């Protein structure tokens, strides 16, 4: 049985595609109403798992200066909190899977490009508060964390917390399971030398993910339960 489960958020535990695309659209309508980014480009950026800075840089370049970056990200987050959160839904089977992990006392972590506050709000709004400890939710502004596939979120953030607060002195990466939907998630798992479950139902580029040969492939969160017990 695994000793730690690390979940991606967008496209893995939660269906957030509409919330992200609509909030990007609202951000442009607010800050640059003369320009509407093509939905196809937004979809590709979501599929790649790009963070907010990279997303707006791709949609705005060369106008995207460091000053503009802060303004656009702050506006996006404000709009996401008031509009985007209402469009987020947990994928079927999320609660059952987290309940199963909790019943076996398997620590659950979330490593996401989202802000921690947005992740916590989504969990609360969807009846999943308390399933994932707050100190195991890693977001884009978590000290020491770096965007996947960089292993820093695991090596420099999760491991110290697990040792200090959960008594996990020795963490065998071979018993860690990363669950995610994009190339970044699969590569992150490879970089920390864990096993990886690719969620084919998510937003990632299917051909690119398949080429990386993930250890497990699922079409629903319900299928992850069997992997956890193996």
What are these regions (language model features)?
Residues 216-220:
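Short acidic-hydrophobic, aromatic-tinged amphipathic segments that line or gate anion-handling sites
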Residues 113, 200-202, 221:
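Short secondary-structure boundary segments
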Residues 86-87, 115-177, 183, 187-192, ...:
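Substrate-recognition "cap/lid" segment bordering the active-site pocket of phosphatases
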Residues 95-99, 182-185, 200-209:
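Short glycine/proline-centered loop/turn elements that form peptide/ligand docking sites
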């Amino acid at each position: 049985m695994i000793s730690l489960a690390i979940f991606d958020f967008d496209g893995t535990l939660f269906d957030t595609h509409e919330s992200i695309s609509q909030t990007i659209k609202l951000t442009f309508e607010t800050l640059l109403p003369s320009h509407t980014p093509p939905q196809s480009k937004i979809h590709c950026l979501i599929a790649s798992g790009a963070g907010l800075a990279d997303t707006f840089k791709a949609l705005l370049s060369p106008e995207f200066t460091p000053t503009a970056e802060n303004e656009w990200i702050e506006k996006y987050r404000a709009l996401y909190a008031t509009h985007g959160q209402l469009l987020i839904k947990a994928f079927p089977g999320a609660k059952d899977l987290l309940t199963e992990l909790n019943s076996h006392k398997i620590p659950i972590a979330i490593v996401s490009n989202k802000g921690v506050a947005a992740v916590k709000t989504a969990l609360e709004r969807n009846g999943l508060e308390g399933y994932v400890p707050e100190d195991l939710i890693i977001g884009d502004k978590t000290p020491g964390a770096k965007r996947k596939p960089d292993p820093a979120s695991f090596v420099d953030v999760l491991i110290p917390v697990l040792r200090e607060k959960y008594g996990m002195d020795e963490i065998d990466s071979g018993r860690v399971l990363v669950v995610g939907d994009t190339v970044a998630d699969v590569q992150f798992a490879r970089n920390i030398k864990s096993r990886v479950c690719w969620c084919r139902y998510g937003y990632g580029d299917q051909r690119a993910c398949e080429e990386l040969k993930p250890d497990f492939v699922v079409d629903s969160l319900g299928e992850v339960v069997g992997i956890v017990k193996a």
